[in-house]
C-alpha cells in the first residue's frame, strides 16, 4: 500500500498544466473499491524536484537503502544518486501527465488509478500490484507475419491497376 491510499484521485478541474506534488492521505479500507482524494497544492520546489518535506517519492536515503538491498558493499557517487533521483522524478511526472490526459479524455475531473494503470500497461508494460485489471483488457499489437505482408502487398498492387 502506498502513502496515497489504495486508489488515488486527483482533481483536474483547476489545472491547465499538471505538475504533480502528492499530498498524503490515510489509507482506506480494502484495495478493491475504495478511493482517496489527493489535492495538488502547487508546483515542485527548486530544481524541478520535490523536496523531502513535500513527500518526495524517492529520497536519497530510500535510494541508498535500495542499493544496499542489491549489494551491501556498493556505494553510489553523489552525481549518480542525483541522476537516479532526477530520472525517477521525471518518470513520475511523465506518468502522471499522461494519466491526467487519459482522465481528461474520458471527460473526468479526477485522476483515478485506472488512468495510471492504463498508461503503465500500454506504454511501459508495467502492472500495479494489488489492483486487478477487470476493466482494462490486455492490449497486444498483432504481429504481422511475412505471409500477411505479401498478401497486403498483392492487394495494394491490384488496387493500383
Swiss-Prot record:
SUPFAM superfamilies tied to this protein = Histone-fold
* Regions of compositional bias (Polar residues) in chain numbering: 26-36
List the residue ranges of the region (Disordered): 15-55
Which controlled-vocabulary keywords does the entry list?
A: Isopeptide bond, Nucleus, Phosphoprotein, Transcription, Transcription regulation, Ubl conjugation
Q: Which GO terms describe its molecular function?
A: DNA binding; protein heterodimerization activity; TBP-class protein binding
List modified residues, type Phosphoserine.
Answer: 51
Entry's localization field: Nucleus
Query: The Histone-fold domain covers which part of the protein?
Result: 56-128
Q: Which residues get modified to Phosphothreonine?
A: 43, 59
Q: Name one Pfam family in it.
A: TFIID_20kDa
Q: Name one GO biological process term.
A: RNA polymerase II preinitiation complex assembly
> Main localisation, per the record?
nucleus
- One cellular component GO annotation, for this chain's record? SAGA complex
Covalent crosslink: Glycyl lysine isopeptide (Lys-Gly) (interchain with G-Cter in SUMO2)? 19
Q: Which family does it belong to?
A: Belongs to the TAF12 family.
How does the record describe its quaternary structure?
A: Component of the TFIID basal transcription factor complex, composed of TATA-box-binding protein TBP, and a number of TBP-associated factors (TAFs), including TAF1, TAF2, TAF3, TAF4, TAF5, TAF6, TAF7, TAF8, TAF9, TAF10, TAF11, TAF12 and TAF13. Component of the TATA-binding protein-free TAF complex (TFTC), the PCAF histone acetylase complex and the STAGA transcription coactivator-HAT complex. Component of the PCAF complex, at least composed of TADA2L/ADA2, TADA3L/ADA3, TAF5L/PAF65-beta, SUPT3H, TAF6L, TAF9, TAF10, TAF12 and TRRAP.
The protein's job, in short, is: The TFIID basal transcription factor complex plays a major role in the initiation of RNA polymerase II (Pol II)-dependent transcription. TFIID recognizes and binds promoters with or without a TATA box via its subunit TBP, a TATA-box-binding protein, and promotes assembly of the pre-initiation complex (PIC). The TFIID complex consists of TBP and TBP-associated factors (TAFs), including TAF1, TAF2, TAF3, TAF4, TAF5, TAF6, TAF7, TAF8, TAF9, TAF10, TAF11, TAF12 and TAF13.
Protein name, UniProt field? Transcription initiation factor TFIID subunit 12
Per the UniProt entry, what species is this protein from, by scientific name?
Bos taurus (Bovine)
Q: Which gene encodes it?
A: TAF12
Amino acid at each position: 500500500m502506498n502513502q496515497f491510499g489504495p486508489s488515488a484521485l486527483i482533481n483536474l478541474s483547476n489545472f491547465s498544466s499538471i505538475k504533480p506534488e502528492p499530498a498524503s492521505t490515510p489509507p482506506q479500507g480494502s484495495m478493491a473499491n475504495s478511493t482517496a482524494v489527493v489535492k495538488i497544492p502547487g508546483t515542485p520546489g527548486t530544481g524541478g524536484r520535490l523536496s523531502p518535506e513535500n513527500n518526495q517519492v524517492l529520497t536519497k536515503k530510500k535510494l541508498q537503502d535500495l542499493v544496499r538491498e542489491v549489494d551491501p558493499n556498493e556505494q553510489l557517487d553523489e552525481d549518480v544518486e542525483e541522476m537516479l533521483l532526477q530520472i525517477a522524478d521525471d518518470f513520475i511526472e511523465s506518468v502522471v501527465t499522461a494519466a491526467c490526459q487519459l482522465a481528461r479524455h474520458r471527460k473526468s475531473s479526477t485522476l483515478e488509478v485506472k488512468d495510471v494503470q492504463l498508461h503503465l500497461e500500454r506504454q511501459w508494460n508495467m502492472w500495479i500490484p494489488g489492483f486487478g485489471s477487470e476493466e482494462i483488457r490486455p492490449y497486444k499489437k498483432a504481429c504481422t507475419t511475412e505471409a500477411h505482408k505479401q498478401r497486403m502487398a498483392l492487394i495494394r498492387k491490384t488496387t493500383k491497376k
